[in-house]
From Swiss-Prot:
The keyword Protease does not apply. Keywords: Cell membrane, Membrane, Transmembrane, Transmembrane helix. It comes from Chromohalobacter salexigens (strain ATCC BAA-138 / DSM 3043 / CIP 106854 / NCIMB 13768 / 1H11). One of its GO terms (cellular component) is plasma membrane. InterPro entries: DUF1328. Pfam families: DUF1328. This is UPF0391 membrane protein Csal_2627. The keyword Membrane applies. The chain crosses the membrane at residues 5-25, 27-47. Belongs to the UPF0391 family. It is found in: Cell membrane.
Amino acid sequence: MLNYAIIFLIIAIIAGVLGFGGIAGAAATIAKVLFFVFLILFIVSLVRSRGR
């Protein structure tokens, strides 16, 4: 899942440099959502493993 976030972040950066506002905005939004989902899952896995 982190790979998808990185891929969409790279697409957003490239599209932003080239000036494609709509594509950059959509890719950046997807990258942000995937990043936060991954971050939440990471924190949950840390908390659950600490209990064992």
